[in-house]
Amino acid sequence: MAIDALFFDVGNTLLFPNRKKMLHSLHEQQVFPSEELLRQIERETKQQFDALVESHSAVDHGFWWMFYSRLLNELGIPDENTCAELVARTQTSSNWCDIRPGTREALRRLGTQYRLGVISNADGKIADILAHCGIADCFEGITDSGIVGKEKPHPAIFEAALQSMGVKAEQSLYTGDVYCVDYLGSTSVGMQCVLFDVAEAYAQKGLPRVESLEDLETLLTTKDR
């Protein structure tokens, strides 16, 4: 069935962590993890977190406890207070404020062919952050777990987004970066899904994946043929 609507995750899909804000407590200790190490930890944590969520119940934010615990162990500073502060910073939408060049332009192009929406596990303020970053007006609907009261992968947040825009699940495609949260959550309500896999955590999983919005445009062009 033809795709009418595209929905996007925000963190690590449309917006990315501002390292200066996110890693402030490490920088205060004169610890500056490399981007290569952060990508490696992200890949490893996603694979571990997916396995955990598929066998138990866990919320999306539990990912960051695992991520920073692993990172701090790798850095040789396994401090619980530092870990808690780092995790808390991921739960503040304003710290997700880095945007890739060309994001608005790609969204505007996609918006000429599809209806666009957002589904994000956030703190009720994600619409303000998207506006601050200059892309809120690209979306017809913005669904925030802090407002809905349910986090991905719970079906209710996906269903709320579909209802808010009046679109059918089978005519919608969702793009997000965590398999167990975004892929399993969206497909459980009948949506199609493409993983936004900048860290290459799912390169060997055999699922639809892209590493940029431009990749998504190309993939959709192929699907529409």
Predicted feature residues:
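Asp-based, Mg2+/Mn2+-dependent phosphohydrolase catalytic module
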Residues: 1-10, 36, 79-82, 104, ...
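N-terminal helical cap/lid subdomain that shapes the substrate entry/recognition surface
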Residues: 2-104, 108
